[in-house]
């Protein structure tokens, strides 16, 4: 990847389009497939055939029912979808700046999230799992039939490595994702119904096929590791630039994976706004180009490969769910006393989040999340009165955000919670208001009205 040394846009002519993130690959691909499905015809049949060719069947890698069979249809029930961005250090992904395959061999689950779609299709909850979380990884079957030893307190992003047995070939994706799926099911104590895998190279192709995305970079970035050098401001990010921003870690915020996940969630929210606003009806050529790139960028479970079978789920998720009812949350974690560079699930908060998904319920009171509008908020306590809403901030930036905070419960009220954990996982009322105002401001001013 060449160094990125850009200047903020000056309302001049710029090629414009839309942007997708590895963590939102499922919705990006399915949005176009659904539109084509609604129009019917040869184009739909051709794309469905291409999509079916990207199916990965993991039944052969089941150990004692680890890879549980799920119903043929998603209709009428809650659904949990695993989305994994792979961190391969070889081939095209390595050329894009992922690293040297001799340094970090094999496939890794660099970005992992679980998308929960409620049974009534009114709510989408997306839980990201930090890659440096220490978890139990079960025994996993390799494609040669051998089985790995189960491990405890292991790095979460080693799950794909163990399943793929250190391999990096296309044939290793199946056993790799099977191991990640089993690990997540063990961690969350719930069934994963479907999965999707995206790699770095595919991520870049998808974004470039869309034309890029407008995004407001909050501060100057100088990151040698990600090869990203960019001023603060409203930018049209290409696939290469967006990938660099996605990978950038130590040069932003506190340098943690948690803060990076938060920035990625902001990018996903920007994608949601752009995707829902795009008019594919008037630009079917652009849609076809994007879909062909997107389909080649992913591998999916058999039930997602049959788009027509589960169209009702996808249509509701992408076309009907209000952005305020889409919630991105990072699994609550804490720093273990024996290793400041790792994380462990923060209990009981982490278990409460997973139980909410398992039982198809709202996120627990006090949970920090980013909504589909890009605002970072806290789940309010319904028993606490809320203040009346303040006027929406104007498009002119002001020194003091005008949004009024929502009263929320303090997660530390739980007698079993560790107060130190709340520092990392809960937002103050002031931050809630500031972030909501910032999200509204960003949506109102980036991209500029003349773009």
Report the location of each language-model feature:
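Non-catalytic, solvent-exposed segments at the cell envelope interface
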Residues: 2-451
